[in-house]
A protein has these predicted regions:
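Sec-dependent N-terminal signal peptides
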Residues: 1-10
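Surface-exposed beta-loop interaction hotspot
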Residues: 114-164
Length: 261
């Protein structure tokens, strides 16, 4: 108990002024996302998650906009457009859609007004939880969990130790504090044998200590980018690996030619 209290006291709270917002750059990145068990057990539910970050002027306010597009073997699985204030990355608005075989759910939120809407069929308890969370969005600054791949690298990992971040994502009933601990350093080498990623290795239990569930991130120090993520939950892994170039189609498919009679 005393050890747990000492560990909690050692956490350093992250405020908007601590974020390395100046390191954000417009661009597009794609992650391969897949689920798997032990090595050799096979993979499942593979997806390509592409995010485009751009600087825009939204309703007269300088903003960073993150467009997400997730695609699996059946088509589009998820899209999101999140608008962040350019100075402190507060969430100004977000539209998010999840497409599943049994339902399509779209949420729209305006955090400063504590307002959100849900389109699509949801179990009553999940809808109630989401609507409860909407009302808490205007209660101070929070970090948008949905934008973590783009924004997590901006945390002050150079401090070392444990960083405490006030987080929220649509679906939660309220923002909560989540601890990210710098476990050490790792170097990843790309397939060309020469490109090196000198990374912080960062771990979190996603605000549920003792659950046995973890997220671990390899965050490149120089580039401030997530190179790899390994999540452990329910006895399996979910991995995300940054591709060397974004998976974006450059040339359109040729028009189909009618079959000869």
């Amino acid at each position: 108990m005393l050890l747990a209290l000492a560990f909690a006291a050692a956490a350093s709270t992250v405020t908007p002024s601590d974020l390395h917002v100046d390191r954000l750059q417009p661009g597009t990145a794609t992650y391969l996302v897949y689920f798997h068990g032990a090595p050799g057990s096979g993979i499942s539910r593979a997806m390509l998650a592409t995010s485009t970050l751009s600087r825009e002027r939204i309703d007269g306010q300088d903003a960073w906009v993150i467009e997400q597009h997730w695609e699996n073997e059946t088509g589009v699985a998820h899209t999101a457009r999140t608008v962040h204030a350019a100075d402190d990355l507060a969430t100004l608005s977000q539209v998010s859609t999840w497409i599943r075989p049994d339902a399509t759910i779209t949420t729209r939120v305006v955090p400063a007004e504590g307002r959100g809407t849900i389109e699509g069929e949801l179990p009553a308890d999940r809808r109630e939880r989401m609507e409860k969370g909407f009302a808490t969005m205007d209660d101070g600054w929070w970090f948008n969990w949905h934008s973590d791949l783009a924004l997590l690298p901006l945390l002050p990992y150079e401090r070392g130790g444990t960083l405490r971040v006030h987080l929220f994502d649509v679906g939660m009933d309220a923002p909560k504090d989540v601890d990210y601990t710098v476990l050490g350093e790792r170097t990843l080498v790309a397939g060309d044998g020469s490109t090196r990623y000198d990374c912080w290795l960062v771990e979190t239990e996603s605000g549920s200590p003792g659950s046995g569930n973890y997220q671990r991130f390899w965050i490149d120090k120089a580039r401030r980018v997530v190179v790899k993520e390994e999540d452990v939950f329910n006895g399996q892994y979910r991995s995300k690996v940054l591709l060397g170039v974004p998976a974006v189609v450059e040339f359109a498919l040729p028009a189909s030619t009618p079959a000869a009679p």
